Amino acid sequence: MSQYTEKEPSVMDQESSKAAWPKPAGGYQTITGRRYGRRHAYVSFKPCMTRHERSLGRAGDDYEVLELDDVPKENTSGSSSLDQVHPALPNEPTVEKSETEISTCGPALNQSTESSPSIATVCHSEEVRETLESNTNLHNRTETEHTPAVCNVSSVQNGIMLVHTDSYDPDSKHDENGSLQLGAEAVEGGRHQKGLGRAVFELENGEAEIYADLSPSVPSLNGEISEAFEELDSAPLEKSSTADAELVHQNGQEFQRSSEDGVVRKRRQDDTDQGRQTENSTEDADCAPGHVEQNTSDRANHHGSSPEQVVRPKVRKVISSSQVDQEIGFNRHEAKQRSVQRWREALEVEECSSDDPIIKCDDYDGDHDCMFLTPTYSRVTQRETERNRVTSENGATASGRQESRDNAFWNACGEYYQLFDKDEDSSECSDGEWSASLPHRFSGTEKDQSSSDDSWETLPGKDENDPELQSDSSGPEEENQELSLQEGEQTSLEEGEIPWLQYNEVNESSSDEGNEPANEFAQPEAFMLDGNNNLEDDSSVSEDLDVDWSLFDGFADGLGVAEAISYVDPQFLTYMALEERLAQAMETALAHLESLAVDVEVANPPASKESIDGLPETLVLEDHTAIGQEQCCPICCSEYIKDDIATELPCHHFFHKPCVSIWLQKSGTCPVCRRHFPPAVIDASAAASSDPDPDASPANDNAEEAP
């Protein structure tokens, strides 16, 4: 038998030279199939002389067709996931392996054992029939004993064998008796999964079929499926603890395996039978070269590097209808990520995933239809319910994963809000521009809220719900989430929100006018007080700032102060309020002073009517020489005109006769100097005025006497 040596490029630390079986003339053809919803998967290998046989299989099943090319060709491609190794059967009696053991048999291998209650049906690869009988108990946990493997092998021509495996014990790796085991190893992300069980060997028509039924060992490890699988060394042999010797002969020679204590035990917990144990009888057979390759329904992951040779077939990915539906859902979700509500719903959908953050499952009657984010295809069976049970060793791992998921959630929330705030900051106007619009009576035309040029800033009346949970996922989903946040979200006004108001000077203002905030808002410097503390308009300032005073006319039009001036500078509002308070205080003070002055003046007795009438009167001339330098009346502030009658008080102050008469009737003082108008003076003047009468009377008498 010819042998050749190769070195796998993908495994750096493994053996540098490995033996391989010769490749048949027609090459090897591998057909794998899977009937979804069941626990069994199958793979068949056979030498093929023509490539037309690759289409074998029953309609309605999903097949993955692989063609194993020769080793040197595969080694030239570093990116290929198919690393094929054909090791030859060694001449050594035994080859020890840590986890798996399998015996390679030739044309005449006869094995007789006590069979387990559940024995699957084996059929030809042309008909591709599947195992119909399976154990439905989902609670087989932490058992270290194994059901003896059932082997029934008939003589065939080409030395190919058929293997059936059905594993129910996830912890059977720790079997102390070294049972006959069949497993698969793959390295990815520091995870591993074990598949062990009974095997049925049958050699028919040069075909080898492997029916693998592997259950996940740990719930947290079941969700991660490797895209490349590692195949066991071809026909590795391992001694049990009490096995005597195993001899392997090549090219038609015989090898005998004698094992007195080769007892393999396994306990299967069924609903009807528990603790059933069987023993394998000794096996004597003539064996010829055989080639066994293994493909399992669930690709196992092993933590750490393995020194054994591995084969990683390039597998065409089978895309199920559920995955297509999920991808369509992602596309639809990506198209609607402008809405905050859509984003929140997407996070809620992601929260509905199972305990393992890698898997998103939709439950339906019977099985679980699951989509794996990394890798993108797999199927989880009913045994997924066992994932709720974990061992103490894996409990720490689960808690660590929970912490990592929590940390990832809070980190994602922080990134979300950071991006959300960034979008809000970018949407706000700079340099004092106001980012919301007035009601339509001010803005004129209704703005399109969906326009990218418009920005809205609202006072929320009710809080928005935070994203409840974000699953720890990788790949394109996170990219889609980041893109959706960076796009910016245009939110419309909802019920309970109060819009900020923005006044436009002209309803149909152009874009360049809208960019000048100084033209749109009243400035505090435009309002000034005159000498009498009256609010006046400085025309120069008003023209420079182009203030529209008509805005303040809307106060009485039902707009309300809060609505009409909500855009005005708060300092200006404070200034206006202070000015109003000051005006009110001035009015109050003046009224109080007037009341005090009236009281003082009332204290002085008014002048008598006789004294008032006795005041001297002077006719005002054109040159005002009669009244001196006085130009106007101090009481009425009116200028003296020609022919006005002026009255002079004893203090030599001139007044209009009507004005001073009214004043003296209220207070007997001078309105200018507050000097009392003395009644004595009035009496004296009256007496002086009355003295000429007696003088006149004698004169009159003398006149009368003269005739």
Curated annotation (Swiss-Prot):
Residues 530-707 are annotated as: Interaction with PRKAR1A, PRKAR2A and PRKAR2B. One of its GO terms (molecular function) is zinc ion binding. The modification Phosphoserine is found at residues 306, 320, 339, 430. Residues 1-32, 72-120, 250-314, 379-405, 424-493, 685-707 are annotated as: Disordered. Residues 1-10, 257-276, 381-390 have a biased composition (Basic and acidic residues). The modification N-acetylserine is found at residue 2. GO terms for biological process: inflammatory response; innate immune response; long-term memory; positive regulation of JNK cascade; positive regulation of p38MAPK cascade; positive regulation of toll-like receptor 2 signaling pathway; proteasome-mediated ubiquitin-dependent protein catabolic process; protein ubiquitination. Residues 465-481 have a biased composition (Acidic residues). GO terms for cellular component: centriolar satellite; cytoplasm; endoplasmic reticulum membrane; glutamatergic synapse; Golgi membrane; plasma membrane; postsynaptic density. It is an enzyme of class 2 (transferase). Residues 74-83, 109-119, 293-308, 391-401, 482-491 have a biased composition (Polar residues). Residues 549-569 are annotated as: Mediates interaction with TBC1D31. Residues 685-701 have a biased composition (Low complexity). It holds the Pfam family zf-RING_2. Gene3D superfamilies: Zinc/RING finger domain, C3HC4 (zinc finger). It is a peripheral membrane protein. Pathway: Protein modification; protein ubiquitination. Its EC number is 2.3.2.27. It is found in: Cytoplasm; Cell membrane; Endoplasmic reticulum membrane; Golgi apparatus membrane. It comes from the Eukaryota. InterPro entries: Znf_RING, Znf_RING/FYVE/PHD. It catalyses: S-ubiquitinyl-[E2 ubiquitin-conjugating enzyme]-L-cysteine + [acceptor protein]-L-lysine = [E2 ubiquitin-conjugating enzyme]-L-cysteine + N(6)-ubiquitinyl-[acceptor protein]-L-lysine. Has E2-dependent E3 ubiquitin-protein ligase activity. Responsible for ubiquitination of cAMP-dependent protein kinase type I and type II-alpha/beta regulatory subunits and for targeting them for proteasomal degradation. Essential for PKA-mediated long-term memory processes. Through the ubiquitination of MFHAS1, positively regulates the TLR2 signaling pathway that leads to the activation of the downstream p38 and JNK MAP kinases and promotes the polarization of macrophages toward the pro-inflammatory M1 phenotype. Plays a role in ciliogenesis by ubiquitinating OFD1. Binds ubiquitin-conjugating enzymes (E2s). In vitro, interacts with the ubiquitin-conjugating enzyme, UBE2D2. The phosphorylated form interacts with PRKAR1A, PRKAR2A and PRKAR2B. Binds the catalytic subunits of cAMP-dependent protein kinase. Interacts with MFHAS1. Interacts with TBC1D31; the interaction is direct and recruits PJA2 to centrosomes. PANTHER family: E3 UBIQUITIN-PROTEIN LIGASE PRAJA (PTHR15710), E3 UBIQUITIN-PROTEIN LIGASE PRAJA-2 (PTHR15710:SF5). This is E3 ubiquitin-protein ligase Praja-2. The lineage of its organism: Eukaryota, Metazoa, Chordata, Craniata, Vertebrata.
